Amino acid sequence: MVSPLDDILVIEIDNWMASPSAGAILADLGARVIKIEPPSGDPMRNMGRAPKIDSPLKTFDFQFDVDNRGKESLVVDLTQPEGTAIVQHLCSKAQIFMCNLLLERQQKYHLDPETLFAINPTLVHATLTGYGTTGPDAWRP
């Protein structure tokens, strides 16, 4: 079956709700989405578990699985130069890079729009943060 986003590669660095949900929709539409996670894993992996219920599902994290359905996961340590190089290499081949990192963090890891556009001028660089990029709460993640 042909999907609308076949042949689209998305590199995603994010956690919590909005941005992972957007990535899941892109995967639903046929994009190949590679989720980059830190060595400690996405903090959402353990947020939705219900360990107090007596069920085989008590270790199943529904929210994480819903928000990350259809994605591949790759562990990358962005605090190391090799980690940044891996993500930049992936972005050189991707059509979309999406993240919910504040601009300062994007710059720290050399994943800001200017740096990635120099590597891939046709890349769509999408930032989705909880409080936007301007205004009094823009500094909040």
What do these predicted regions represent?
Residues M1-P141:
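N-terminal helix-loop segment corresponding to the beta1-alpha1 unit
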